[in-house]
């Protein structure tokens, strides 16, 4: 029997002054200066608000955000393996449905959000993400994409662009172009293979209001949703820490 679980209607943000002042992702992390994924985490958390549970598969945002006695989350957060963010989120969503059906939970149904890097979303974690989408769980799956496995040393990932210079694809005499494979397209991958998905969008840390509104649109929908957020990485991209937003804008403008 279907259970009516979602009653919220998060309003869209029209102007900067309408951005929530309350912070759900606060100081207390160890991300690199100029970190794009940290910026997107703050924006997603602001948009989602206090009625939120975050799932963090292993990656940059787990390692830098989960120091003992010093974490930046002002809402419930749970670490998962890099392979199973989608599976853990599915279990949490199903558990809340059971509690509601049995009358053991009277509060609001929470926003359940998986915050996975490109590896945890469309590479090592692809199977669990795909299963979540296929089964129709009411979860927002965010892929924050810095185009590499930055946490473990800037190795190539499925979203590293053609010609990318990573520790696994260094340009040299034999392969001067670096990475020879073209990247996956996460939004098209989700749309093409998952008929139950209700909302898919792309966003960039360079456009915060657009990003937050897409988060809210996804959370207002009942069913699986997917957001692909482009988030430059100064360490992996070998760029100055104050150029993150500029590079993100250029990436959007150049496709």
Predicted feature descriptions by range:
Residues 102, 108-112, 123-140, 144-255:
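Glycine-rich ThDP/TPP pyrophosphate-binding loop and its adjacent helix/strand module
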């Amino acid at each position: 029997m279907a259970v009516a679980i979602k009653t919220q209607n998060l309003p869209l943000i029209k102007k900067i002054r309408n951005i929530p002042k309350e912070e759900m992702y606060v100081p207390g992390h160890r991300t690199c200066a100029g970190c794009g994924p940290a910026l997107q985490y703050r924006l997603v958390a602001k948009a989602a608000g206090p009625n939120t549970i975050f799932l963090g598969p292993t990656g940059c945002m787990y390692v830098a955000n989960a120091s003992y006695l010093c974490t930046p989350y002002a809402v419930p957060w749970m670490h998962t393996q890099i392979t199973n963010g989608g599976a853990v989120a599915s279990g949490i969503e199903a558990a809340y449905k059971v509690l509601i059906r049995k009358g053991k939970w009277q509060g609001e149904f929470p926003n359940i959000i998986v915050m996975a890097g490109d590896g945890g979303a469309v590479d090592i974690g692809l199977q669990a993400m795909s299963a979540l989408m296929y089964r129709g769980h009411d979860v927002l799956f965010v892929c924050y994409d810095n185009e590499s496995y930055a946490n473990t040393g800037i190795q190539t990932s499925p979203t590293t662009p053609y010609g990318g210079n990573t520790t696994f694809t260094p340009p040299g005499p034999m392969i001067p172009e670096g990475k020879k494979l073209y990247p996956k397209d996460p939004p098209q991958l989700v749309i093409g293979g998952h008929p139950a998905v209700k909302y898919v969008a792309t966003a960039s840390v360079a456009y915060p209001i657009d990003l937050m509104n897409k988060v809210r649109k996804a959370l207002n929908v009942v069913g699986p949703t997917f957001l692909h957020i482009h988030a430059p990485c100064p360490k992996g991209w070998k760029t100055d820490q104050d150029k993150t937003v500029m590079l993100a804008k250029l990436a959007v403008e150049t496709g």
